[in-house]
């Protein structure tokens, strides 16, 4: 039985899908104006792992993750680079795909772009105006927060708290609002900015409306799971809920999931603070699987501190698992013991996708393997577990020359010519091949 920590209820809840055996899942994707940083990547990796585990447990997952390709940040970047907003979006979508492929992330069922849904967004806003949940003001359209039942319940805030916090605002936009906490559904464009025609004049959608429309148009009014980083709880996901439920009269999502931050020196990694490392740069010195494995060492909801030591530890541990995976079969496998490992792994992951505990089981199983319990069934079980974390080992085939040296060393040992055997072993070490003699034969690892 899978349990999910639901941000809305602040509790672990048994997962019950809307439709047996199927899951509708929407995860907020990147605003494509720059390379993603390691903190952004954690969200992508966390929900890819969750999606993979659902599939491991037999579910068919419709996994949607968008590209926000209409945004002020994209417009500003276009001005800086002297290209169009469309060219900015295309450039960084391509970079995103390259980065997450290196991290072993599966393509989403669909990666929608905002520009594909402009007519749907306008209809959505018109519907909210007709229902009295939104109003036009000088070419902008705002959502009436006070009409939303239990607004900000996701972020555990009250409307009174928000109104108190906004009471001192005097900027031009606030003057156009009925209430300072109302948020934009449609924003009028300035001269020279990218815009679309609408009943309220040329403009572009607000950020929050974009995800609501893409989710409902593709997956329907109510989905099983909506996810994203913890920083999206408020205002983004809060506003998605308000406008979506105002339009449909139905629950927007049955479970809300949020991943923790990546910290640098215990401070949240972010572009605004300037303390970030892009995945593009990290991959110049790190294998993508190492970074992916680093993320798996901590529960997805908890913050994780990005340090060189932590990453190098992940690299060492991953190498150990690769060497374990690539060793020759030994036979003598207790089928019940293998099943016990599988059951223990499922129990760990069923508890809110606790990858850290799941990885612990993998290492316990590796120790068991290295004590002489390895056959094809064990290898497949290990591969299946690791694949949930995006770790796929491509078995290395040794050069014929190296294979020949290993065979000659075996012959020398059989003839008790230990001097020659040692000489060959030392020669292999210089080529990065380390040999280990066991009761089941010789094993090699790439050093």
Curated annotation (Swiss-Prot):
Its main location: cytoplasm. Pfam families: CysS_C, DALR_2, tRNA-synt_1e. PANTHER family: CYSTEINE--TRNA LIGASE, CYTOPLASMIC, CYSTEINYL-TRNA SYNTHETASE. It comes from the Bacteria. It is found in: Cytoplasm. Monomer. GO terms for cellular component: cytosol. The keyword Nucleus does not apply. NCBIfam families: cysS (TIGR00435). Keywords: Aminoacyl-tRNA synthetase, ATP-binding, Cytoplasm, Ligase, Metal-binding, Nucleotide-binding, Protein biosynthesis, Zinc. Its EC number is 6.1.1.16. ATP binds at residue 271. It catalyses: tRNA(Cys) + L-cysteine + ATP = L-cysteinyl-tRNA(Cys) + AMP + diphosphate. HAMAP family: Cys_tRNA_synth. A motif ('KMSKS' region) lies at residues 268-272. This is Cysteine--tRNA ligase. CDD domains: CysRS_core. GO terms for molecular function: ATP binding; cysteine-tRNA ligase activity; zinc ion binding. The gene is cysS. It is an enzyme of class 6 (ligase). Its cofactor is Zn(2+). Zn(2+) binds at residues 28, 211, 236, 240. A motif ('HIGH' region) lies at residues 30-40. Binds 1 zinc ion per subunit. GO terms for biological process: cysteinyl-tRNA aminoacylation.
